[in-house]
């Protein structure tokens, strides 16, 4: 609702005119509302300036003050309009009276400075006069005679800003700068040295770990050969172990001579295994294979030497060369009968593949190693000596002291079993020890 200035219009106009009249002793007027209505009335006038006006402000009301002050720069009269909203006024009243500010500014026109105040700190006389001085725009004064030229006698010589250079202080300043520069350089060198030592230590530990793995593999091979020599049996490792060790050593020397880091022994083993699988497939006779079912049967013994789990192939006894192979083939056919059905008349079209005999040597080598160690290859448990992280999903990860169950010995250097998380996969044999 709009503010009402007509009800007490003559009194309001008289108070305003008395303030703006320069020769009038009245220098301030205070206006407020009549109760909770929007009618404006004169709350009071005075001649005491800002100090007296501030004392009349009520913290529980909305009031409008109009005051005449003297500009400290020019000495001319200036008018100040104060929109006072006390801290005790409720929010509804504050919102309603906020729309009346522009109407009151139009009525009390001619104000040079307008101040919106809520607390006593906002209406301190010093603060108001400072705002009036800033609003004048220039520091000048009227009605003041300028001082005429006066002969004050001879003036003193103009002082110089030159300062004599102090060699000692200059040396100290330069020395201080050099000291901090040297300290920063030493700190940088120290950090670089620590980084270099850490890198050397890491490389040394990595080299020791690789050497330890190679030594453990060599000791395991040597122990395997000694056990076979003590038992009087021919050592298969004399035919397979030494070429494998020589291949690993030769690959390691090639990498070191090329200036590169030697690969992990497991990677060398994988490369050797892939090469053996390729050679075995090439040496077979694909011209005699006319059935996909028989081709699958012939490739199953090939994968038994690798990492995939397959049924164990029976080994021929001493002095027997050709008899056990058909029994192995027939047993494989018996296991596959629910899925594949081979006509009887096709049996005469296939000959006994030499691939089974070629892979028999590898299986015999693994079985001899298993028998020499005193375990059957399945249902074993082992405790982890070192931590190992799986390189892919066919391997398992474990930490020291973890138990690995259901171990299957598929190779001298790689076994399979269930890890701590229940995942079944391969792991290096020299990272664990069997539990009796």
Curated annotation (Swiss-Prot):
MF annotations from Gene Ontology: actin binding; actin filament binding; protein domain specific binding; structural constituent of postsynaptic actin cytoskeleton
SH3 domain span: 377-436
Entry-linked PROSITE patterns: ADF_H (PS51263), SH3 (PS50002)
Bias-annotated ranges (Polar residues): 276-286, 294-303
N6-acetyllysine: residues carrying this PTM: 176, 296
GO BP annotations, alphabetical order: adaptive immune response; endocytosis; neuron projection morphogenesis; podosome assembly; Rac protein signal transduction; synapse assembly
Phosphoserine found at: 160, 277, 280, 283, 291
Database matches in InterPro entries: ADF-H (IPR002108), ADF-H/Gelsolin-like_dom_sf (IPR029006), Drebrin-like_SH3 (IPR035717), SH3-like_dom_sf (IPR036028), SH3_domain (IPR001452)
Compartments, as annotated in UniProt: Cytoplasm, Cytoskeleton; Cell projection, Lamellipodium; Cell projection, Ruffle; Cytoplasm, Cell cortex
Residue ranges the record marks as coiled coil: 179-233
Record PTM Phosphotyrosine, positions in chain: 340, 350
Annotated region (Disordered), positions in chain: 185-341
Annotated ADF-H domain residues: 2-133
Gene3D superfamilies: Severin, SH3 Domains
Alphabetical list of CDD domains matching this protein: ADF_drebrin_like, SH3_Abp1_eu
Tissue-by-tissue expression: Detected in hippocampus neurons and in the Purkinje cell layer in cerebellum (at protein level). Predominantly expressed in brain, thymus and spleen. Also found in testis, heart and lung. Little or no expression detected in ovary or muscle.
PTM-bearing positions, type Phosphothreonine: 26, 299
GO cellular component: anchoring junction; cell cortex; clathrin-coated vesicle membrane; cytoplasm; cytosol; dendrite; early endosome; glutamatergic synapse
Family of this protein: Belongs to the ABP1 family.
Subunit structure: Interacts with SHANK3, SYN1 and PRAM1. Interacts with SHANK2. Interacts with FGD1, DNM1 and MAP4K1. Interacts with ANKRD54. Interacts with COBL. Interacts with WASL and WIPF1.
Its biological purpose: Adapter protein that binds F-actin and DNM1, and thereby plays a role in receptor-mediated endocytosis. Plays a role in the reorganization of the actin cytoskeleton, formation of cell projections, such as neurites, in neuron morphogenesis and synapse formation via its interaction with WASL and COBL. Does not bind G-actin and promote actin polymerization by itself. Required for the formation of organized podosome rosettes. May act as a common effector of antigen receptor-signaling pathways in leukocytes.
Free-text comment on this protein's domains from its UniProt entry: The SH3 domain mediates interaction with SHANK2, SHANK3 and PRAM1.
Protein name listed in UniProt: Drebrin-like protein
């Amino acid at each position: 609702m709009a503010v009402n200035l007509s009800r007490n219009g003559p009194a309001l106009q008289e108070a305003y005119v008395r303030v703006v009249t320069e020769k009038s002793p009245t220098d301030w007027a205070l206006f407020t509302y009549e109760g909770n209505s929007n009618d404006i009335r004169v709350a009071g006038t005075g001649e005491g300036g800002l100090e007296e006006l501030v004392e009349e402000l009520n913290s529980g009301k909305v009031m409008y003050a109009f005051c005449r002050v003297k500009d400290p720069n020019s000495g001319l009269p200036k008018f100040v309009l104060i929109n006072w909203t006390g801290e005790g006024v409720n929010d509804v009243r504050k919102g309603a009276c906020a729309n009346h500010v522009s109407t009151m500014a139009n009525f009390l026109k001619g104000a040079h400075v307008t101040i919106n105040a809520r607390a006593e700190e906002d209406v301190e006389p010093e603060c108001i006069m400072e705002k009036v001085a800033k609003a004048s725009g220039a520091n000048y004064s009227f009605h003041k005679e300028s001082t005429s030229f006066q002969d004050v006698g001879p003036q003193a010589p103009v002082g110089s800003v030159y300062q004599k250079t102090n060699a000692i202080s200059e040396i100290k300043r330069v020395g201080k700068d050099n000291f901090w520069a040297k300290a920063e350089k030493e700190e940088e060198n120290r950090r670089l040295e620590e980084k270099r030592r850490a890198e050397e230590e890491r490389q040394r530990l990595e080299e020791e770990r690789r050497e330890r793995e190679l030594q453990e593999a060599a000791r395991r091979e040597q122990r395997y050969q000694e056990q076979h020599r003590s038992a009087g049996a021919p050592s298969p490792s004399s035919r397979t172990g030494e070429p494998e060790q020589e291949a690993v050593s030769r690959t390691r020397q090639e990498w070191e001579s090329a200036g590169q880091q030697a690969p992990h022994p497991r990677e060398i083993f994988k490369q050797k295994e892939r090469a053996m699988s390729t050679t075995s497939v090439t040496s077979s006779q694909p011209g005699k294979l006319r059935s996909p079912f028989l081709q699958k049967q012939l490739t199953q013994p090939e994968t038994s030497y690798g990492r995939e789990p397959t049924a164990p192939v029976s080994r021929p006894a001493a002095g027997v060369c050709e008899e056990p192979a058909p029994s192995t083939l027939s047993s494989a056919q018996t296991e596959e009968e629910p899925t594949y059905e081979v006509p009887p008349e096709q049996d005469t079209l296939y000959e006994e593949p030499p691939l089974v005999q070629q892979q028999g040597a590898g299986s015999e080598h693994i079985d001899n190693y298993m028998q020499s160690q005193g375990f059957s290859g399945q249902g074993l448990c082992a405790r982890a000596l070192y931590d190992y992280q799986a390189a892919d999903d066919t391997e398992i990860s474990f930490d020291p002291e973890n138990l690995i169950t259901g171990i299957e010995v598929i190779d001298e250097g790689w076994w399979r079993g269930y890890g701590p998380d229940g995942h079944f996969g391969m792991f290096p044999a020299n990272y664990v020890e069997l539990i009796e």
